[in-house]
Amino acid sequence: MHRGAATQGLVFTTPLSPFILPFAVDTPLLQVDALLKQYDTGGDEPLTVLRDLDLAVQEGEILAIVGESGTGKSTLLHLLGALDRPTDGTVRFAGTDLFAKSDEELAAFRNRSIGFVFQFHHLLPEFTALENVAMPALIQHRSLADVTPRAHELLALLGLDDRADHRPRTLSGGEKQRVAIARALMNEPALVLMDEPTGNLDARTAEPLHREIERLSREMDHTFVLASHDPSLAEVAGRVLRLEHGTLHPLAAADEMAPEAGPSDDGHAGG
């Protein structure tokens, strides 16, 4: 297989601190209690995006969080994935309080235990599809040669086995998102967070990707949390919650949702 010159013999050597999590059988994979997220806007009062939010996600569950743009879906996923810290409240992963950990420990935790898929894929343009998929393992100071079989396996699983040597500029929008999903699964994470993963695709391109996400959730041992304004994506979930006024409300079925147009939020006060 041809490898891009940018990653010939590439290996990351920066050591990461171990992040060992005890996991009782009856403990939710994710437990969120009284979560508060505010931002300083320079005015008299902070901007409150999430308030008094509680959530439990069981191992193996597929949860959809829906809501209009600007309601804080992306902000919530950033907190669940330890990309940001809350103003108050706790997020426990397998019983362990994430935000009692140092930034270095959280970085190690994220790379090992969380897979992220965002609306905009952020693939590295100078790398091939395979090299982009392998990136989470390379960050864990594994060599490209060692992780190539796993990356090939994931690309094949998503119907991209003939695109391994292609760079992002030669891929369609749907193919790029499949590469992003494969990358999120590279380290076999316990939790996969998907923030508007089909939000920038048209309906014709998005529908097959919805089916792929549903199939992956059935066939692979992962927990999925999907955030979307798109009700058709939420249909793959076993449980649907609406984020409104900074907190979560249950929905009886995905068909209770009205389609909403709009992109993901910017991490401060949106989607």
Curated annotation (Swiss-Prot):
SUPFAM superfamilies: P-loop containing nucleoside triphosphate hydrolases. ATP binds at G67, E68, S69, G70, T71, G72, K73, S74. Keywords: ATP-binding, Cell inner membrane, Cell membrane, Membrane, Nucleotide-binding, Translocase, Transport. Disulfide bonds: none annotated. The keyword Transcription does not apply. Pfam families: ABC_tran. Its EC number is 7.6.2.-. Signal peptide: none annotated. Its main location: membrane. It is found in: Cell inner membrane. InterPro entries: AAA+_ATPase, ABC_transporter-like_ATP-bd, ABC_transporter-like_CS, ABC_transpr_LolD-like, MacB-like_ATP-bd, P-loop_NTPase. It comes from the Bacteria. The keyword Cell inner membrane applies. Residues 30-270 form the ABC transporter domain. One of its GO terms (molecular function) is transmembrane transporter activity. Belongs to the ABC transporter superfamily. Lipoprotein translocase (TC 3.A.1.125) family. The complex is composed of two ATP-binding proteins (LolD) and two transmembrane proteins (LolC and LolE). This is Lipoprotein-releasing system ATP-binding protein LolD. It comes from Salinibacter ruber (strain DSM 13855 / M31). The gene is lolD.
